[in-house]
Protein backbone atom coordinates (compact mmCIF):
# COMPACT_ATOMS: atom_id res chain seq x y z
CA UNK A 1 0.00 0.00 0.00
CA UNK A 2 1.15 3.47 -0.51
CA UNK A 3 0.65 6.94 0.44
CA UNK A 4 0.88 9.99 -1.67
CA UNK A 5 -0.60 13.40 -1.64
CA UNK A 6 -1.24 14.19 -5.19
CA UNK A 7 -3.21 16.13 -7.60
CA UNK A 8 -5.29 19.00 -6.26
CA UNK A 9 -8.53 19.96 -7.88
CA UNK A 10 -10.31 23.26 -7.58
CA UNK A 11 -12.41 21.87 -4.77
CA UNK A 12 -11.67 22.47 -1.13
CA UNK A 13 -12.20 18.83 -0.31
CA UNK A 14 -9.73 17.57 2.21
CA UNK A 15 -9.09 14.22 0.65
CA UNK A 16 -5.75 12.91 -0.20
CA UNK A 17 -5.84 9.32 -1.18
CA UNK A 18 -3.40 6.62 -0.33
CA UNK A 19 -1.40 6.35 -3.48
CA UNK A 20 2.00 6.21 -4.91
CA UNK A 21 4.09 5.60 -7.91
CA UNK A 22 1.73 6.64 -10.67
CA UNK A 23 -0.96 7.88 -8.38
CA UNK A 24 -2.43 11.34 -8.66
CA UNK A 25 -5.46 12.22 -6.58
CA UNK A 26 -7.87 15.05 -7.12
CA UNK A 27 -9.91 16.99 -4.65
CA UNK A 28 -7.37 17.25 -1.92
CA UNK A 29 -6.72 20.51 -0.18
CA UNK A 30 -7.38 24.14 -0.89
CA UNK A 31 -6.12 27.04 1.13
CA UNK A 32 -8.20 28.27 4.03
CA UNK A 33 -6.23 31.49 4.07
CA UNK A 34 -7.28 33.36 0.94
CA UNK A 35 -10.22 32.56 -1.33
CA UNK A 36 -9.32 35.11 -4.02
CA UNK A 37 -6.23 33.96 -5.85
CA UNK A 38 -3.35 36.40 -5.89
CA UNK A 39 -1.77 36.93 -9.30
CA UNK A 40 0.39 39.03 -11.58
CA UNK A 41 -2.10 41.88 -11.89
CA UNK A 42 -2.33 42.24 -8.13
CA UNK A 43 1.44 42.60 -8.03
CA UNK A 44 1.61 45.05 -10.94
CA UNK A 45 -1.16 47.16 -9.42
CA UNK A 46 0.74 47.56 -6.17
CA UNK A 47 -0.21 44.63 -3.94
CA UNK A 48 3.31 43.92 -2.72
CA UNK A 49 4.66 42.22 0.36
CA UNK A 50 6.64 45.23 1.56
CA UNK A 51 3.39 47.08 2.23
CA UNK A 52 2.22 44.61 4.85
CA UNK A 53 5.30 42.91 6.27
CA UNK A 54 6.66 44.47 9.46
CA UNK A 55 9.15 43.53 12.15
CA UNK A 56 6.33 41.44 13.61
CA UNK A 57 5.96 39.40 10.43
CA UNK A 58 7.91 36.39 11.64
CA UNK A 59 7.76 32.63 11.30
CA UNK A 60 8.48 30.88 14.60
CA UNK A 61 8.58 27.13 15.13
CA UNK A 62 8.60 25.40 18.50
CA UNK A 63 10.38 22.05 18.50
CA UNK A 64 11.22 19.32 20.94
CA UNK A 65 10.70 15.68 21.76
CA UNK A 66 7.32 14.09 22.44
CA UNK A 67 5.46 15.50 25.49
CA UNK A 68 7.76 18.48 26.03
CA UNK A 69 5.08 21.17 26.18
CA UNK A 70 5.49 22.52 22.66
CA UNK A 71 1.80 23.20 22.16
CA UNK A 72 1.36 25.18 25.36
CA UNK A 73 4.42 27.35 24.78
CA UNK A 74 3.61 27.93 21.11
CA UNK A 75 0.05 28.98 21.89
CA UNK A 76 1.09 31.35 24.68
CA UNK A 77 3.82 32.95 22.57
CA UNK A 78 1.35 33.47 19.72
CA UNK A 79 -1.18 35.07 22.07
CA UNK A 80 1.37 37.41 23.64
CA UNK A 81 2.87 38.49 20.31
CA UNK A 82 -0.42 38.69 18.43
CA UNK A 83 0.63 35.93 16.04
CA UNK A 84 -1.47 33.16 14.53
CA UNK A 85 -0.94 29.77 16.17
CA UNK A 86 -0.81 26.64 14.03
CA UNK A 87 -1.16 23.49 16.18
CA UNK A 88 0.98 20.55 15.14
CA UNK A 89 -0.07 19.04 11.82
CA UNK A 90 -1.23 15.47 12.24
CA UNK A 91 -2.66 12.81 9.97
CA UNK A 92 -5.98 14.66 9.71
CA UNK A 93 -4.56 18.14 9.08
CA UNK A 94 -6.23 18.45 5.64
CA UNK A 95 -9.55 17.33 7.14
CA UNK A 96 -9.34 19.82 10.00
CA UNK A 97 -8.69 22.81 7.76
CA UNK A 98 -11.10 22.14 4.89
CA UNK A 99 -14.52 20.67 4.30
CA UNK A 100 -16.63 20.27 7.42
CA UNK A 101 -13.56 19.80 9.61
CA UNK A 102 -14.41 16.21 10.50
CA UNK A 103 -11.77 13.46 10.21
CA UNK A 104 -12.16 11.21 7.20
CA UNK A 105 -11.49 7.49 7.04
CA UNK A 106 -7.95 6.13 6.81
CA UNK A 107 -8.42 5.39 3.10
CA UNK A 108 -8.39 9.14 2.47
CA UNK A 109 -5.56 9.91 4.87
CA UNK A 110 -2.56 7.88 3.84
CA UNK A 111 -3.90 4.54 5.10
CA UNK A 112 -1.67 4.93 8.14
CA UNK A 113 -2.11 5.03 11.90
CA UNK A 114 -0.08 6.68 14.63
CA UNK A 115 -1.57 4.32 17.21
CA UNK A 116 -0.55 1.31 15.15
CA UNK A 117 2.96 2.71 14.87
CA UNK A 118 3.23 2.96 18.65
CA UNK A 119 1.77 -0.53 19.10
CA UNK A 120 3.78 -2.25 16.36
CA UNK A 121 6.48 -0.01 14.84
CA UNK A 122 7.98 -2.95 12.96
CA UNK A 123 4.71 -3.92 11.27
CA UNK A 124 5.48 -5.59 7.96
CA UNK A 125 2.65 -3.81 6.13
CA UNK A 126 4.72 -0.62 5.81
CA UNK A 127 2.62 1.48 8.20
CA UNK A 128 5.64 3.15 9.80
CA UNK A 129 6.96 4.71 6.63
CA UNK A 130 3.51 5.50 5.24
CA UNK A 131 2.90 7.41 8.46
CA UNK A 132 6.15 9.35 8.22
CA UNK A 133 5.68 10.13 4.54
CA UNK A 134 2.11 11.28 5.10
CA UNK A 135 3.06 13.46 8.06
CA UNK A 136 5.79 15.15 6.03
CA UNK A 137 3.22 16.00 3.37
CA UNK A 138 0.84 17.29 6.05
CA UNK A 139 3.57 19.49 7.50
CA UNK A 140 4.38 20.70 3.99
CA UNK A 141 0.76 21.76 3.51
CA UNK A 142 0.68 23.44 6.90
CA UNK A 143 3.92 25.30 6.30
CA UNK A 144 2.57 26.56 2.98
CA UNK A 145 -0.61 27.68 4.77
CA UNK A 146 1.45 29.48 7.40
CA UNK A 147 3.57 31.28 4.81
CA UNK A 148 0.47 32.16 2.83
CA UNK A 149 -1.10 33.66 5.94
CA UNK A 150 2.05 35.65 6.65
CA UNK A 151 2.36 36.99 3.10
CA UNK A 152 -1.36 37.70 2.79
CA UNK A 153 -1.95 39.44 6.11
CA UNK A 154 1.48 40.36 7.48
CA UNK A 155 0.62 38.62 10.76
CA UNK A 156 3.36 36.45 12.25
CA UNK A 157 2.84 32.73 12.73
CA UNK A 158 3.89 30.17 15.35
CA UNK A 159 4.01 26.48 14.43
CA UNK A 160 4.68 23.32 16.36
CA UNK A 161 7.41 21.55 14.40
CA UNK A 162 7.79 22.02 10.65
CA UNK A 163 9.08 20.44 7.46
CA UNK A 164 12.59 21.40 8.56
CA UNK A 165 12.49 19.25 11.71
CA UNK A 166 10.32 16.40 10.44
CA UNK A 167 13.37 14.30 9.54
CA UNK A 168 14.24 13.66 13.20
CA UNK A 169 11.51 11.03 13.32
CA UNK A 170 12.71 9.42 10.12
CA UNK A 171 16.22 9.09 11.53
CA UNK A 172 14.91 7.62 14.76
CA UNK A 173 12.75 5.13 12.87
CA UNK A 174 15.66 4.01 10.74
CA UNK A 175 18.06 3.73 13.67
CA UNK A 176 15.56 1.54 15.49
CA UNK A 177 15.02 -0.69 12.47
CA UNK A 178 11.40 0.36 11.91
CA UNK A 179 11.93 1.27 8.24
CA UNK A 180 14.23 0.21 5.40
CA UNK A 181 17.10 2.16 3.86
CA UNK A 182 15.04 2.45 0.66
CA UNK A 183 12.42 4.36 2.64
CA UNK A 184 15.05 6.80 3.87
CA UNK A 185 16.26 7.32 0.30
CA UNK A 186 12.71 7.91 -0.90
CA UNK A 187 12.02 10.41 1.88
CA UNK A 188 15.23 12.32 1.20
CA UNK A 189 14.45 12.44 -2.51
CA UNK A 190 11.00 13.88 -1.87
CA UNK A 191 12.35 16.31 0.69
CA UNK A 192 15.13 17.52 -1.61
CA UNK A 193 12.68 18.53 -4.35
CA UNK A 194 10.08 20.11 -2.06
CA UNK A 195 11.77 21.88 0.83
CA UNK A 196 14.14 23.84 -1.42
CA UNK A 197 11.37 26.26 -2.41
CA UNK A 198 10.59 27.36 1.15
CA UNK A 199 12.21 29.89 3.41
CA UNK A 200 13.14 28.56 6.86
CA UNK A 201 11.63 30.01 10.03
CA UNK A 202 12.97 33.28 11.40
CA UNK A 203 13.27 31.58 14.78
CA UNK A 204 13.40 28.03 16.12
CA UNK A 205 12.62 27.47 19.79
CA UNK A 206 13.84 24.13 21.11
CA UNK A 207 12.55 22.69 24.39
CA UNK A 208 15.21 20.40 25.83
CA UNK A 209 13.65 17.78 28.08
CA UNK A 210 15.74 14.72 29.08
CA UNK A 211 14.43 11.35 27.89
CA UNK A 212 13.66 10.06 31.44
CA UNK A 213 11.49 13.13 32.05
CA UNK A 214 9.80 12.66 28.66
CA UNK A 215 8.96 9.09 29.61
CA UNK A 216 7.61 10.21 32.97
CA UNK A 217 5.32 12.70 31.25
CA UNK A 218 4.15 10.07 28.78
CA UNK A 219 3.26 7.73 31.63
CA UNK A 220 1.45 10.53 33.44
CA UNK A 221 -0.49 11.39 30.30
CA UNK A 222 -1.73 7.82 30.24
CA UNK A 223 -2.16 7.24 26.51
CA UNK A 224 -1.93 3.43 26.19
CA UNK A 225 -0.32 3.67 22.77
CA UNK A 226 2.25 6.36 23.59
CA UNK A 227 3.22 4.46 26.72
CA UNK A 228 4.76 1.79 24.48
CA UNK A 229 7.37 4.20 23.08
CA UNK A 230 10.87 3.03 23.98
CA UNK A 231 13.55 5.19 25.55
CA UNK A 232 15.88 4.27 22.67
CA UNK A 233 13.47 5.78 20.12
CA UNK A 234 13.10 8.94 22.19
CA UNK A 235 16.87 9.20 22.56
CA UNK A 236 17.34 8.93 18.80
CA UNK A 237 14.87 11.77 18.30
CA UNK A 238 16.79 13.91 20.78
CA UNK A 239 20.10 13.05 19.12
CA UNK A 240 18.79 14.02 15.69
CA UNK A 241 17.60 17.34 17.07
CA UNK A 242 20.86 18.18 18.82
CA UNK A 243 23.40 16.75 16.39
CA UNK A 244 21.79 17.68 13.09
CA UNK A 245 18.73 19.92 13.26
CA UNK A 246 19.89 22.62 15.68
CA UNK A 247 23.38 23.05 14.15
CA UNK A 248 21.86 23.32 10.67
CA UNK A 249 19.15 25.78 11.68
CA UNK A 250 21.56 27.95 13.68
CA UNK A 251 23.16 28.84 10.34
CA UNK A 252 19.82 29.82 8.78
CA UNK A 253 17.89 31.47 11.57
CA UNK A 254 17.81 32.44 15.23
CA UNK A 255 17.67 29.60 17.76
CA UNK A 256 16.53 29.70 21.38
CA UNK A 257 16.82 26.71 23.70
CA UNK A 258 14.94 26.24 26.95
CA UNK A 259 14.92 23.59 29.64
CA UNK A 260 11.68 21.99 30.76
CA UNK A 261 11.40 24.49 33.61
CA UNK A 262 12.29 27.52 31.50
CA UNK A 263 9.72 26.55 28.87
CA UNK A 264 6.99 27.11 31.46
CA UNK A 265 7.70 30.85 31.42
CA UNK A 266 6.30 32.10 28.13
CA UNK A 267 6.71 35.71 29.28
CA UNK A 268 10.47 35.24 29.48
CA UNK A 269 10.46 33.57 26.05
CA UNK A 270 8.63 36.55 24.55
CA UNK A 271 11.15 38.93 26.11
CA UNK A 272 13.99 36.89 24.61
CA UNK A 273 12.31 37.00 21.20
CA UNK A 274 11.96 40.78 21.33
CA UNK A 275 15.67 41.14 22.05
CA UNK A 276 16.71 39.09 19.02
CA UNK A 277 18.18 41.00 16.09
CA UNK A 278 17.05 38.62 13.34
CA UNK A 279 20.11 39.59 11.38
CA UNK A 280 20.81 36.34 9.53
CA UNK A 281 19.14 33.93 7.18
CA UNK A 282 17.62 34.02 3.69
CA UNK A 283 14.69 36.21 4.72
CA UNK A 284 17.06 39.18 4.68
CA UNK A 285 17.75 38.65 0.98
CA UNK A 286 14.10 38.70 -0.07
CA UNK A 287 12.44 41.51 -1.99
CA UNK A 288 8.99 42.10 -3.42
CA UNK A 289 9.75 40.03 -6.50
CA UNK A 290 10.95 36.92 -4.65
CA UNK A 291 8.12 37.15 -2.12
CA UNK A 292 5.66 37.48 -5.00
CA UNK A 293 6.85 34.17 -6.43
CA UNK A 294 6.77 32.56 -2.98
CA UNK A 295 3.18 33.68 -2.49
CA UNK A 296 2.19 32.25 -5.86
CA UNK A 297 3.69 28.93 -4.80
CA UNK A 298 2.14 28.63 -1.35
CA UNK A 299 -1.36 29.51 -2.52
CA UNK A 300 -1.22 26.79 -5.19
CA UNK A 301 -1.63 23.55 -3.23
CA UNK A 302 -1.26 21.50 -6.39
CA UNK A 303 2.22 22.91 -6.82
CA UNK A 304 2.98 22.54 -3.12
CA UNK A 305 2.32 18.80 -3.25
CA UNK A 306 3.30 18.15 -6.84
CA UNK A 307 6.74 16.74 -6.13
CA UNK A 308 5.69 14.58 -3.20
CA UNK A 309 4.84 12.09 -5.92
CA UNK A 310 7.97 10.81 -7.59
CA UNK A 311 8.29 7.84 -9.99
CA UNK A 312 9.99 5.47 -7.59
CA UNK A 313 8.49 2.09 -6.76
CA UNK A 314 8.36 1.57 -3.02
CA UNK A 315 6.04 -1.15 -1.68
CA UNK A 316 5.30 0.78 1.52
CA UNK A 317 3.65 3.63 -0.38
CA UNK A 318 2.57 2.16 -3.70
CA UNK A 319 -0.86 0.92 -4.73
CA UNK A 320 -2.29 0.02 -8.11
CA UNK A 321 -4.16 2.27 -10.48
CA UNK A 322 -7.45 0.41 -10.00
CA UNK A 323 -7.36 0.88 -6.24
CA UNK A 324 -6.46 4.53 -6.69
CA UNK A 325 -9.47 5.06 -8.96
CA UNK A 326 -11.74 3.18 -6.56
CA UNK A 327 -10.72 5.27 -3.55
CA UNK A 328 -11.00 8.49 -5.55
CA UNK A 329 -14.48 7.54 -6.74
CA UNK A 330 -15.55 6.75 -3.18
CA UNK A 331 -14.22 10.07 -1.99
CA UNK A 332 -16.11 11.99 -4.65
CA UNK A 333 -19.30 10.31 -3.44
CA UNK A 334 -18.92 11.71 0.08
CA UNK A 335 -21.37 14.52 0.96
CA UNK A 336 -20.09 17.91 -0.13
CA UNK A 337 -16.96 16.53 -1.82
CA UNK A 338 -17.98 16.39 -5.46
CA UNK A 339 -17.86 20.10 -6.23
CA UNK A 340 -16.45 23.28 -4.74
CA UNK A 341 -17.99 24.57 -1.48
CA UNK A 342 -21.39 26.12 -2.08
CA UNK A 343 -22.13 23.98 -5.13
CA UNK A 344 -23.23 20.71 -3.53
CA UNK A 345 -26.99 20.32 -3.29
CA UNK A 346 -26.74 17.18 -1.14
CA UNK A 347 -25.43 19.26 1.78
CA UNK A 348 -28.05 21.99 1.41
CA UNK A 349 -26.35 24.42 -0.96
CA UNK A 350 -28.93 26.55 -2.77
CA UNK A 351 -29.16 29.09 -5.58
CA UNK A 352 -26.25 27.40 -7.30
CA UNK A 353 -27.28 28.72 -10.71
CA UNK A 354 -26.82 32.30 -9.45
CA UNK A 355 -23.27 31.81 -8.22
Swiss-Prot record:
Positions carrying N6-succinyllysine: 285
Statement: the UniProt record of this protein carries the keyword Phosphoprotein: yes
InterPro entries, A to Z: Deoxyribonucleoside_kinase, DNK_dom, NDUFA10, P-loop_NTPase
Subcellular location: Mitochondrion matrix
The organism's place on the tree of life at top rank: Eukaryota
Cofactor: FAD
Keyword Mitochondrion (UniProt): yes
Co-factor remark: Binds 1 FAD per subunit.
Keyword annotations from UniProtKB, A to Z: Electron transport, FAD, Flavoprotein, Mitochondrion, Phosphoprotein, Respiratory chain, Transit peptide, Transport
Entry's Gene Ontology cellular component terms: cytoplasm; mitochondrial matrix; respiratory chain complex I
Segment annotated as transit peptide: 1-35
Biological process annotations from GO: mitochondrial electron transport, NADH to ubiquinone
In-chain residues carrying the UniProt-annotated modification Phosphoserine: 250
Short name of one Pfam family: dNK
Entry comment on modification after translation: Phosphorylation at Ser-250 by PINK1 is required for the binding and/or reduction of the complex I substrate ubiquinone.
Main location: mitochondrion
Family from the record: Belongs to the complex I NDUFA10 subunit family.
Oligomeric form and interacting partners: Complex I is composed of 45 different subunits. This a component of the hydrophobic protein fraction.
Function comment: Accessory subunit of the mitochondrial membrane respiratory chain NADH dehydrogenase (Complex I), that is believed not to be involved in catalysis. Complex I functions in the transfer of electrons from NADH to the respiratory chain. The immediate electron acceptor for the enzyme is believed to be ubiquinone.
Protein name: NADH dehydrogenase [ubiquinone] 1 alpha subcomplex subunit 10, mitochondrial
Source species of the chain: Pan troglodytes (Chimpanzee)
Amino acid sequence: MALRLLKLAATSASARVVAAGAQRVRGVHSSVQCKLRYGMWHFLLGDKASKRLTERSRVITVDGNICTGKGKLAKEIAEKLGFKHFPEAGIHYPDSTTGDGKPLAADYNGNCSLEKFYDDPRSNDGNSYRLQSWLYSSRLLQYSDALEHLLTTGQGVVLERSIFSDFVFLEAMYNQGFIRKQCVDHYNEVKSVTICDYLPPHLVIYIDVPVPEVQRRIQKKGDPHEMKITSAYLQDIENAYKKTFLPEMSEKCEVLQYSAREAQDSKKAVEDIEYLKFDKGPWLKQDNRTLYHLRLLVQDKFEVLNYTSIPIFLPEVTIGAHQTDRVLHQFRELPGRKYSPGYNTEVGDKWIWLK
